[in-house]
Amino acid sequence: METLCLRASFWLALVGCVISDNPERYSTNLSNHVDDFTTFRGTELSFLVTTHQPTNLVLPSNGSMHNYCPQQTKITSAFKYINTVISCTIFIVGMVGNATLLRIIYQNKCMRNGPNALIASLALGDLIYVVIDLPINVFKLLAGRWPFDHNDFGVFLCKLFPFLQKSSVGITVLNLCALSVDRYRAVASWSRVQGIGIPLVTAIEIVSIWILSFILAIPEAIGFVMVPFEYRGEQHKTCMLNATSKFMEFYQDVKDWWLFGFYFCMPLVCTAIFYTLMTCEMLNRRNGSLRIALSEHLKQRREVAKTVFCLVVIFALCWFPLHLSRILKKTVYNEMDKNRCELLSFLLLMDYIGINLATMNSCINPIALYFVSKKFKNCFQSCLCCCCYQSKSLMTSVPMNGTSIQWKNHDQNNHNTDRSSHKDSMN
């Protein structure tokens, strides 16, 4: 029976049950029987890590079982609960932050412009991921299995989970690129003052971003399936990427480099190019009476450019450890290396850190806007104070019209101070 279990587990590893390059695949396989085993796929082989035995069995690519890690490489239950706490914190902060950001842009007419529309699109993508994917992730961590793994709804979640995760990342990446291009356009046409409203070009960009993000995530929905397997005499099912066609095999082979190139390098390169062009444009137009007349106008645009640049830097910091771990698994790992077990432990820890940081990116943008942008900071304070006042009014049975009056008065007070900048504050 033990040999049969090992063969089944080895077969499972070969078809792709891995500690993956992205949160949805990694979390899927990490949570499935975390107290029983965790599989890790390197460049040429897969590990079967058993946490109930004193040693970890390493199954080389030739199928022999003479090589094994002398020490136990495992994922402790402490990490499971740490990840659960982190996920719950990200869920709360992401819900409040992104929902508040969307409310600010929707309720304040002076905030309805092109760049803010892109920021709202980014926040909505993060909110969808936080609301749908994070609860599934927490369930898997605590229950140790995929939700509804024995019915069709579990299959639906298995395809929806990676699809939404990849779509959310795509929306973030493409919105950051669009914001960088928008900042260059704003500086290049520095004599043009745009009024309130979302330009048609920006609306088309947002629709295109969402459509393209969904299209690029389709292979995830196609490839992820519920795969049954036997382990220690028991039948289990896990959600994983299982290539069943030539296209999916090709996608699985190049996915690491595709994710690194498109979902990480592209927004950084795009920002570097357009911010360099923007800097050159500003240096070439240092003089001129019109520029002096529009000095406050240009100051606002520089502040917005700084805000967008901050969002890109945060994105890079959050996602770099995860992509680095993936590249190391692709390029550094060697099954014949005597220190491969130490490398495995290091990559496991790196995956934990990288996935938590990558997930944190879904809730950190509203916080960054609060500290970087004075206008968003004022709006956040007004909105949150309004909510607190409304809650207090409900507890003390105060009529709700007082709340709306306070919000309107506060908005009127801020409107005068922001009148000179609302035309292009986030333009």
From Swiss-Prot:
Transmembrane segments: 81-102, 113-132, 160-181, 206-229, 257-278, 307-328, 348-372
Organism: Homo sapiens
Functional summary from the UniProt entry: Receptor for endothelin-1. Mediates its action by association with G proteins that activate a phosphatidylinositol-calcium second messenger system. The rank order of binding affinities for ET-A is: ET1 > ET2 >> ET3.
Glycosylation sites: 29, 62
Name of the protein in question: Endothelin-1 receptor
Main location as per UniProt: membrane
SS bond list: 158-239
Residues recorded as bearing Phosphoserine in the entry: 425
